[in-house]
Amino acid sequence: MKLVRFEDIHGNETFVNAERVNFISDFGSGKTELNFGGKEATVYVEMSVAAVAKALLKAAVDK
């Protein structure tokens, strides 16, 4: 399991298991949604979709 550190929109440090992310999407205004399979299992971060995707892909490749 490879954890990726993000800061959520509330300024809290959040660690995400890159293997468990179902999808990411642009939420507007530089915010990105990371979804893990349900409405309650969603994290919003102040990063572009490209930056989030890069961090998650890097974690997946660096196994």
Model-derived regions: residue spans:
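Eukaryotic intrinsically disordered, low-complexity regulatory linkers and tails enriched in Ser/Thr/Pro
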Residues: 1-63
